[in-house]
């Protein structure tokens, strides 16, 4: 029985989907003005793992994650870079895919961009105006009236006067009430804009998620999530917009709110605004992507996770332990899962840990129990060893790990020599990553040059439709 902590009710609840066997999930995506940082990675690795487990549990999952490709930050960065907002956003979206793919994060079913859905956002705003929850100001902005929402603050427990004190004290927009927030923002001279009933402008940040989630998932959503920093004001404002637009209750809008803990560095939240962040691109120059993924799941998803080199090195040691257990096993792809009572026992324990609010660290502990049993079986019972190894890889796949050849990960062939040149596995991965980036940017000459170099030293590349590349020794 799956239990999930619901941010709305502040307690663990037995999860029951709106429609039997199906789950609709909406997660707030990235504002694409810069490279993804490790805080983004933690949130998306967590929801990727939740998605994988729900599928393992038997659900059909419809997963939507939006892309904010127009925003004040995007406009400011485009001006700084002397490029258009379209070009900047498009470039950063491709970089985002490179970063998330390399962490073995599955693509959502839908990734709607805001600029592709301006009309439906305008219609959503129009509906709020018709129902007297929004108004047009003299300077052409459209504002949401928080005073029309009797239970504003239900998710975050913020009171309306706190909203003004903490968030809007510096906001110079014309409003009926200082706590009101913008739905449609009038474009300044030289800024990108779209034509609306209220003049030239662009959507506010909060309205895009209400409009897009409704368009793709309907009025009622099973799971809505994001980082804990989105609880207020973003998700609070989403609740206000969506419940007012559709005349629905808060708990019928979203069954379960899931929020991930922050990644911390020097006891502060890792974020771009504090300028204390590391990009995914920077981190994978030091550590392999699978180690990073393991690390990001090493604390309970609702708790803060402290970034340190020691913590990541410990994650790598843990992975090495698991890969060492798998080393030397000739995998039989037709091994039948669940065909042994012992393996059923491990799977049941794994499910119990994950059913308890997706307890990833406890789920890891089951993998180590299996690795211990596997090491014994490799000596005493080779048939059972193969079965245990297959089940270990199956459960690890739910966590998005142990997808590599153990020999490659452990470095038994870390050095390939050709014409007195050598490449470590880490260098091979780096070259493949560079080639993936070149292909994304249509730099075909560079892509071919990297492939040729790897081919010359006995590396075979296989490009997947997702854009990822798998490699092996010839």
Swiss-Prot record:
Subcellular localization, as worded in the UniProt entry: Cytoplasm
Reaction(s) catalysed (UniProt annotation): tRNA(Cys) + L-cysteine + ATP = L-cysteinyl-tRNA(Cys) + AMP + diphosphate
Motif residue range(s): 'KMSKS' region: 269-273
ATP-binding recorded as keyword: yes
Entry-linked SMART domains: DALR_2
UniProt keyword Aminoacyl-tRNA synthetase, yes or no: yes
Positions of short motif 'HIGH' region: 30-40
Cofactor remark from the record: Binds 1 zinc ion per subunit.
Record-listed E.C. numbers: 6.1.1.16
Protein name per Swiss-Prot or TrEMBL: Cysteine--tRNA ligase
Database matches in HAMAP family: Cys_tRNA_synth
Source organism: Blochmanniella floridana
InterPro entries: Cys-tRNA-ligase (IPR015803), Cys-tRNA-synt_Ia_DALR (IPR015273), Cys-tRNA/MSH_ligase (IPR024909), Rossmann-like_a/b/a_fold (IPR014729), tRNA-synt_1_cat_dom (IPR032678), tRNAsynth_Ia_anticodon-bd (IPR009080)
Similarity annotation: Belongs to the class-I aminoacyl-tRNA synthetase family.
Pfam families: DALR_2 (PF09190), tRNA-synt_1e (PF01406)
